[in-house]
Structures are given as C-alpha cells and as structure tokens.
C-alpha cells in the first residue's frame, strides 16, 4: 500500500488515493490520520518541482481543509503565496501573503510584509501598502530592511498626502543615514 501511496503522490492524484483507502475499512483510521500529511506532501512536491499552478491548487485545498490546526499550515500558506506570486496572480498572492503575515511566530513575516506592501503599492492601494511597510519596519531583522520599510512609508505617505508622516519619516531616514556614515 505504501508503494501505491507513493505513485498517487507523485502523480498528484492524492484525492483518488484517499478515496480508495476509505473503501478499505481496515485502514480507514490510518488514512484519516495521515490525510493531512498526504495532501500537504503532494502539494509540496508540486511546488518543489516548479508546478506552481498545481501547487497553488493543492495548497489551497490543504489550507481550506486543514487550517487552522493542520500540521503544515504556515509552510503551506507560504508556498501557496509564493506559487501565486510566481504565476503573476497578484491578487491571490496578496491574499495569501496577508494571511501569512497574520500568523504569529512566522519565520516568513518579513517576506510576507514586503510582498504585500510592494504589490499593494503597484496597485496604488497606498494605505494597505503603508500598513505593511509599517509592519515590516517593526519586524525588520536588519538595518537595510528597516531602511526599505522607511522608504516605503515615505512613498506611501507622500501618495496619500500625509505631510506630517513624510517629514517625520524623511527626518528618520536622514538620521539613519548620518549614523551610517559615522
């Protein structure tokens, strides 16, 4: 049965395999407990092979079926977001990266904030972009990422007409640059 499972995983037909195992009463319990892992691993394999359309579909199925509470929700969310981004389906990517940025304890937080901020900016959704640049500034792990966030805040503030924020952010950027030169 393990060999059969592997074939179904590699051919991206995990739903057929799960339906088959449910017809076998003896292993029905085992299939139910491993369904989370099988659905994820199948979608992850598609992602790793660069089949982003199939990966996005499989990961979305996983997220809908098992999250919150699934074993792989955070990584699945990241792979789904990245798949949509690579497919240039930016609205879906924004949705997935936003959901990822809302997850606590997230090792992908910086990338999620950068992606949502930049994609929103490109769509001229400056308030959304501003929000994610501000979040990026809070979680930045390096001074260069903090500077990127501040530049984003400056641009968004300019576009929404928030002169106070423009002045404050520009002053902060100048202070950071003068410290860097020292």
Q: Where would I find each of the regions flagged by the language model?
A:
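Acidic, polar-rich low-complexity tracts and alpha-helical solenoid repeat scaffolds
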Residues: 1-182
């Amino acid at each position: 049965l393990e060999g059969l499972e592997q074939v179904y995983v590699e051919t991206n037909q995990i739903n057929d395999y799960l339906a088959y195992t449910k017809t076998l009463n003896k292993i029905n319990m085992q299939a139910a407990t491993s369904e989370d892992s099988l659905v994820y691993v199948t979608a992850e394999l598609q992602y790793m092979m660069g089949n982003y359309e199939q990966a996005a579909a499989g990961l979305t199925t996983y997220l809908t079926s098992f999250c919150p509470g699934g074993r792989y929700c955070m990584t699945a969310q990241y792979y789904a977001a990245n798949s949509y981004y690579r497919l240039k389906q930016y609205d879906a990517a924004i949705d997935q990266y936003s959901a990822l940025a809302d997850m606590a304890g997230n090792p992908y937080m910086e990338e999620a904030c950068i992606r949502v901020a930049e994609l929103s900016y490109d769509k001229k959704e400056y308030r959304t972009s501003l929000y994610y640049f501000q979040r990026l500034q809070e979680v930045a792990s390096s001074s260069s990422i903090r500077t990127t966030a501040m530049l984003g805040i400056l641009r968004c503030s300019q576009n929404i007409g928030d002169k106070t924020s423009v002045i404050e952010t520009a002053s902060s950027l100048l202070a950071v640059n003068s410290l860097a030169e020292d």
